[in-house]
């Protein structure tokens, strides 16, 4: 949630943010109008309450006919106070509804526009030249079927389209990938977590997902719970309504979970294989930190993602996502896209988002500010403020697409990156099953 005080002080910056996103800049003015009505309604209520309190003292001193007249006025005043309270509550609810709709304020300098308006920051690694090696690369599904490791047909039979079974070495490769990612996170101070796959609507909304209008979210109607599309949701909710101690540095969590997405708007896209599916596994980094440290922490998350990609021997590029392609909560997002040989293009494997204080405000997650001492030596207890939250993908099932295609050999076997071999009992090659 945005800071209404900041919007009130600098509405033009918020209008510019909305314009860059391709969103409704007029929402700024509707919020300001609602805010003005709210403050006016509160002033009216407080004025009437003060008058009511003053009347109470007059009634106590009055006698006879005067007292009866005052009591009649008190009765009317009580009704006026009640009506003013209702008007103030309604104005507050209207303002809150509008503020809740407003996406995060983008970081200054990120590209404006939509999905195709990103800025490429750099490329790393060189895509393999299969023509020079003398063979045509197979796609990940063909390789997976040769390894008897991906079964889309039975996935569809059991659960429908965009579901699958992973088997044998491919299933082990996925687990190895996630375990290697978890170890990298552990080495960098993350606390490992397994998280709930179902969350309450308040947590889903608090993270920035609109449960009423988001067609990507699976809902369990009887229990009013939602399947998460990322462990970010559960990890953001983990400290909801809490005051955190960040004096020792950022709180970093690495969440391992299954993820669920309806892919409602993806008809006809990536229908072959496991690039775009309804269920997958992911190792997600999630951080709580001081707001002033968020930009530097964002760069660290990106560096860890790149470290993982490089250790897996994948060629990739880093892009600065355009404002119109950001999620509601993100102020800035970097994507790492790996080269997919059979598609001849880069595809997203990781993303990392700086959500500034947006999620923390919605979920009431704060930190205690340090004590201060005034000129007279009097110690004043520190107040509280919203923390910053960030997230980033360290590994996910989709990585198998890039791993299988990048490291394939002419006979259909796949060389295992050195990073993953210890998690596969030293196995160096995945071989086709006869």
Curated annotation (Swiss-Prot):
Domain of life: Bacteria
UniProt-annotated location(s): Cytoplasm
PROSITE patterns: AA_TRNA_LIGASE_II
Pathway: Aminoacyl-tRNA biosynthesis; selenocysteinyl-tRNA(Sec) biosynthesis; L-seryl-tRNA(Sec) from L-serine and tRNA(Sec): step 1/1
InterPro entries (alphabetical): aa-tRNA-synt_IIb, aa-tRNA-synth_II, aa-tRNA-synth_II/BPL/LPL, Ser-tRNA-ligase_type_1, Ser-tRNA-synth_1_N, SerRS_1_N_sf, SerRS_core, tRNA-bd_arm
A molecular function GO annotation: ATP binding
Membrane-traversing stretches: none
Keyword Ligase: yes
Record: residues binding L-serine: 230-232, 284, 393
Record's keyword annotation contains Cytoplasm: yes
Function of the protein: Catalyzes the attachment of serine to tRNA(Ser). Is also able to aminoacylate tRNA(Sec) with serine, to form the misacylated tRNA L-seryl-tRNA(Sec), which will be further converted into selenocysteinyl-tRNA(Sec).
Similarity annotation: Belongs to the class-II aminoacyl-tRNA synthetase family. Type-1 seryl-tRNA synthetase subfamily.
Protein name, as recorded: Serine--tRNA ligase
Organism encoding this protein: Kocuria rhizophila (strain ATCC 9341 / DSM 348 / NBRC 103217 / DC2201)
């Amino acid at each position: 949630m945005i800071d209404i005080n900041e919007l009130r002080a600098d509405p033009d910056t918020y209008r510019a943010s909305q314009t860059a996103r391709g969103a409704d800049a007029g929402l700024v003015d509707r919020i300001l109008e609602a805010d003005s009505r709210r403050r006016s309604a509160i002033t009216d209520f407080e004025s009437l309450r003060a008058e009511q309190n003053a009347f109470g003292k007059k009634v106590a001193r009055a006698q006879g006919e005067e007292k009866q007249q005052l009591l009649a006025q008190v009765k009317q005043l009580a009704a006026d106070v009640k009506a003013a309270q209702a008007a103030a509550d309604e104005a507050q609810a209207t303002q809150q509804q509008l503020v809740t709709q407003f996406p995060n304020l983008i970081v200054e300098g990120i590209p404006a526009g939509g999905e195709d308006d990103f800025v490429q920051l750099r490329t790393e690694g060189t895509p393999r030249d299969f023509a020079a090696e003398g063979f045509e690369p197979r796609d990940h599904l063909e390789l997976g079927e040769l390894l008897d490791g991906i079964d889309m047909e039975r996935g569809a039979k059991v659960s429908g389209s965009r579901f699958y079974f992973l088997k044998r070495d491919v299933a082990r490769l996925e687990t190895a990938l996630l375990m290697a990612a978890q170890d990298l996170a552990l080495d960098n101070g993350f606390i490992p977590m397994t998280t709930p796959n179902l969350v309450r609507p308040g947590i889903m909304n608090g993270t920035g997902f609109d449960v009423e209008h988001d067609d990507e979210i699976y809902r369990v109607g009887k229990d009013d719970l939602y399947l998460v599309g990322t462990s970010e949701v559960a990890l953001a909710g983990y400290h909801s309504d809490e005051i955190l101690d960040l004096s020792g540095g950022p709180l970093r969590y690495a969440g391992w979970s299954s993820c669920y997405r309806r892919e409602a708007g993806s008809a006809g896209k990536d229908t072959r294989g496991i690039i775009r599916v309804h269920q997958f596994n992911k190792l997600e980094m999630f951080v709580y930190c001081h707001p002033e440290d968020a930009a530097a922490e964002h760069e660290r998350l990106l560096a860890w993602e790149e470290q993982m990609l490089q250790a897996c021997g994948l060629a990739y590029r880093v892009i600065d996502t355009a404002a119109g392609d950001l999620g509601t909560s993100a102020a800035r997002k970097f994507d790492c896209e790996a080269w997919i040989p059979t598609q001849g293009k880069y595809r997203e494997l990781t993303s990392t988002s700086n959500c500034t204080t947006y999620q923390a405000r919605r979920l009431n997650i704060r930190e205690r500010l340090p004590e201060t001492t005034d000129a007279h030596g009097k110690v004043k207890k520190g107040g509280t403020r919203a923390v910053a939250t960030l997230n980033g993908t360290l590994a996910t099932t989709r990585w198998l697409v890039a791993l299988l295609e990048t490291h394939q050999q002419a006979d259909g076997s796949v060389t295992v990156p050195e990073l993953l071999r210890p998690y596969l009992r030293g196995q160096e090659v995945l071989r086709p099953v006869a």
